[in-house]
């Protein structure tokens, strides 16, 4: 192993081995948070056989600090009383940080795969760990990502509250319940005195409450506001697509109107991915001030044409969704296959969300991805 402070050189390929853990899990310790979203490994695959040795995420640290390790998180859920193993998740930490902050580069640790960019310094980084209130970053890499690696994305924080948080809240409630019960008796007597005083002054609180309930009921029975776009008497270029078939406004897909697959055209802005697609479209001011405009007479109308060029980031998932919609009408069988694959991935993701993690191993994190590990047994894995 290189000495402390030397630069990493991958001139000689080191055979990947699995070693012994220094402990029997991190059951009672707080697991530091990774800066990045995790990778979910395809079941049956071995991370250390697939992971490139320079597989360091982009976006944090300088060139000397592009060194660290991937740390395994084993997962399972209970199905009819039986334990069912779920695909492993792997979290990245920089050298000198995370659950193995004291480990040296290439130390043999079960559940750890070491990686580094060529030329990185073989010494602990000063990057630290992610704060509990900070969101994890999307994974981006210079090279190709193995097909068995699924790069996870952030979801709603509402689902990230752990059982430990609930237990803490439960304790607080039980401690305050006794005080509340004693205070309730005092509050009742004060309320009765106030009501009696108001009645003497001619204020009938009971009638006021009835009127308030009546108004509330009227509001709840009122019709739901109609959000359907009003397109009558509007030019085609001023119409807004609602939920439903858009061909009645914009016509069938053709060489001059080549955006949208069958699902998007049939559902309009009710299509599942419409919000993500809309984010890839330039704003009105961008089109107005950043386009090349021409105009010519066309009978009793003026034909206006504009050309607008802009760039979308290649590594943004929304860009891929957007590109799939271009000329989709011309390749229906290919689009249908892509849609079936998306549905299959969506169903797989829903099943993963049903996973159960034991209370004793769940940490209190603010992000949907926590780095909690189940106990890792000290065995050599071939």
Swiss-Prot record:
Modified residues (Phosphoserine): 156, 254, 256
Compositionally biased intervals (Low complexity): 154-183
Domain of life: Viruses
UniProt xrefs under PROSITE patterns: COV_N_CTD, COV_N_NTD
One Pfam family linked to the record: CoV_nucleocap
Region of interest called Dimerization, as start-end residue ranges on this chain: 231-334
Chain residue ranges for the region called Disordered: 152-240, 331-355
Positions of the CoV N CTD domain: 224-337
Comp. bias regions, Basic and acidic residues: 201-235, 334-354
Gene Ontology molecular function terms on file: RNA binding
Post-translational modification comment from the UniProt entry: ADP-ribosylated. The ADP-ribosylation is retained in the virion during infection.
UniProt-annotated stretches for the region RNA-binding: 33-159
GO cellular component entries: host cell endoplasmic reticulum-Golgi intermediate compartment; host cell Golgi apparatus; ribonucleoprotein complex; viral nucleocapsid
Domain CoV N NTD span(s) in chain numbering: 31-153
Subcellular location: Virion; Host endoplasmic reticulum-Golgi intermediate compartment; Host Golgi apparatus
Assigned keywords, A-Z: ADP-ribosylation, Host Golgi apparatus, Phosphoprotein, Ribonucleoprotein, RNA-binding, Transcription, Transcription regulation, Viral nucleoprotein, Virion
Protein family per UniProt: Belongs to the alphacoronavirus nucleocapsid protein family.
Assembly description: Homooligomer. Both monomeric and oligomeric forms interact with RNA. Interacts with protein M. Interacts with NSP3; this interaction serves to tether the genome to the newly translated replicase-transcriptase complex at a very early stage of infection.
Described function: Packages the positive strand viral genome RNA into a helical ribonucleocapsid (RNP) and plays a fundamental role during virion assembly through its interactions with the viral genome and membrane protein M. Plays an important role in enhancing the efficiency of subgenomic viral RNA transcription as well as viral replication.
Protein name: Nucleoprotein
Species this protein is from: Canine coronavirus (strain K378) (CCoV)
Gene it is expressed from: N
